[in-house]
From Swiss-Prot:
This hormone, released from cells in the corpora cardiaca, causes release of diglycerides from the fat body and stimulation of muscles to use these diglycerides as an energy source during energy-demanding processes. It comes from the Eukaryota. The keyword Nuclease does not apply. GO terms for molecular function: hormone activity. It comes from Mantophasma kudubergense. It is found in: Secreted. This is Adipokinetic hormone.
Amino acid sequence: QVNFSPGW
């Protein structure tokens, strides 16, 4: 599982 959270 890959969780990508940009700080946008």
